[in-house]
Amino acid sequence: GLWFGPRIGKRSLRMATEDNRQAFFKLLEAADALKYYYDQLPYEMQADEPETRVTKKVIFTPKLGRSLAYDDKVFENVEFTPRLGRRLADDMPATPADQEMYRPDPEQIDSRTKYFSPRLGRTMNFSPRLGRELAYEMVPSKIRVVRSTNKTQST
């Protein structure tokens, strides 16, 4: 077979354990000597023991226009409309509901609703798109649609 040379990083186990053991002993001796000389220093030059519990210092700054006291929140002169599906607290002012402001008059309800059969007890209250008023008196009852295949215009 072909020989590609020695495998890089491959060492025998016996040599690796002896090398590691010697390096570990040297590290222990160095740490022991360091501790010995550190203890010889005067007390003022020795570092204080670090605290084992790490605490994060939080500085609370309220937002502009707000105060730290929560009991002085006053909702005077504020028109508050809750989100859809939420209810207002009793002490907050309420704006009239949309159903009360835009309730259609009985004569405005279209007579076409009887043409739609209600499903599951529903009634059809037809309302045009916002900003549009439908006037069916102006629409002719019979509309004639003519299409020309030879591009002649009908009048």
Curated annotation (Swiss-Prot):
Key word Lyase present: no
Recorded superkingdom: Eukaryota
A GO cellular component entry from the record: extracellular region
Coiled-coil region(s): none
Positions carrying Isoleucine amide: 8
Main location: secreted
Tagged with keyword Plastid: no
Subcellular location: Secreted
Classification via InterPro entries: PBAN, Pyrokinin_CS
Molecular-function GO terms, alphabetical: neuropeptide hormone activity
UniProt GO BP: neuropeptide signaling pathway; pheromone biosynthetic process; response to pheromone
Proregion positions: 12-55, 133-155
The entry's keywords: Amidation, Cleavage on pair of basic residues, Hormone, Neuropeptide, Pheromone response, Secreted
Physiological role: A hormone that controls sex pheromone production in females and pheromone responsiveness in male. Also mediates visceral muscle contractile activity (myotropic activity).
Extra information: Juvenile hormone seems to allow PBAN release, which then induces pheromone biosynthesis.
Family classification: Belongs to the pyrokinin family.
Record-given protein name: PBAN-type neuropeptides
